[in-house]
């Protein structure tokens, strides 16, 4: 009986510590130090309504927008409840057909030359919000033409939204597609 009582006391104690105190302290510190990130890194539009998160990719298919990495989520694209890769190998005929269709779509939309991998292959999560600067540059001509802008104007906005490697050596340069498209919309609506 004594063993059951001590086990029960330890269970209740650790439940309170690990299930209540620790999460509350970590959440409080996160909200104090990184308030935007702790709340989901939401991005707001010009009317101050939340339009997405800078951490989760979103579908853009209109020619006036930069297109993100393809989504590999099931049921429908960019389904954050079903995050994950396709698990198709590089020799899978269905996968190769899908990649070829994506390359054709980009060439039909005006992209010239070789297409960066980030525009035809989904990321491991299937929800990557970023593309490489090269993947963005290949879309500049299309976006500029549809928006009635010069390529140089679009390039300047792209350069302003290109993030370099963290600490100068971690990761790769990247462009958040949602933030870039919102910047283009905000410029257009001035």
From Swiss-Prot:
Any one annotated GO CC term: plasma membrane
Major location (coarse): membrane
Keywords of the record: ATP-binding, Cell inner membrane, Cell membrane, Ion transport, Membrane, Nucleotide-binding, Potassium, Potassium transport, Transmembrane, Transmembrane helix, Transport
Compartments, record wording: Cell inner membrane
InterPro entries: KdpC (IPR003820)
TM regions (residue ranges): 9-29
Membrane topology, from the record: Single-pass membrane protein
PANTHER family named among the record's database cross-references: POTASSIUM-TRANSPORTING ATPASE C CHAIN, POTASSIUM-TRANSPORTING ATPASE KDPC SUBUNIT
Assembly mode: The system is composed of three essential subunits: KdpA, KdpB and KdpC.
Role this protein plays: Part of the high-affinity ATP-driven potassium transport (or Kdp) system, which catalyzes the hydrolysis of ATP coupled with the electrogenic transport of potassium into the cytoplasm. This subunit acts as a catalytic chaperone that increases the ATP-binding affinity of the ATP-hydrolyzing subunit KdpB by the formation of a transient KdpB/KdpC/ATP ternary complex.
UniProt family annotation: Belongs to the KdpC family.
NCBIfam families attached to this UniProt entry: kdpC, PRK00315.1
Name of the protein in question: Potassium-transporting ATPase KdpC subunit
Organism whose genome encodes this protein: Citrifermentans bemidjiense (strain ATCC BAA-1014 / DSM 16622 / JCM 12645 / Bem)
């Amino acid at each position: 009986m004594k063993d059951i009582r001590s086990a029960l006391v330890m269970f209740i104690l650790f439940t309170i510590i690990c299930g209540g105190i620790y999460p509350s302290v970590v959440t409080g510190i996160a909200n104090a130090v990184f308030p935007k990130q702790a709340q989901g890194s939401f991005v707001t539009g010009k009317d101050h309504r939340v339009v997405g998160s800078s951490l989760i990719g979103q579908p853009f298919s209109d020619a006036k927008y930069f297109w993100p990495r393809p989504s590999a989520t099931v049921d429908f694209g960019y389904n954050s409840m079903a995050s994950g890769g396709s698990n198709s190998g590089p020799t899978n005929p269905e996968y190769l057909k899908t990649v070829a269709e994506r390359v054709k779509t980009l060439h039909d939309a005006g992209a010239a030359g070789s297409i960066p991998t980030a525009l035809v292959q989904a990321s491991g999560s299937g929800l990557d919000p970023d593309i490489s600067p090269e993947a963005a540059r290949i879309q500049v001509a299309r976006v500029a033409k549809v928006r009635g802008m010069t390529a140089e104007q679009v390039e300047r906005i792209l350069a302003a939204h290109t993030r370099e490697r963290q600490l100068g050596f971690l990761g790769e340069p990247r462009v958040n597609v949602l933030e870039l498209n919102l910047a283009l919309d905000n410029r257009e609506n001035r």
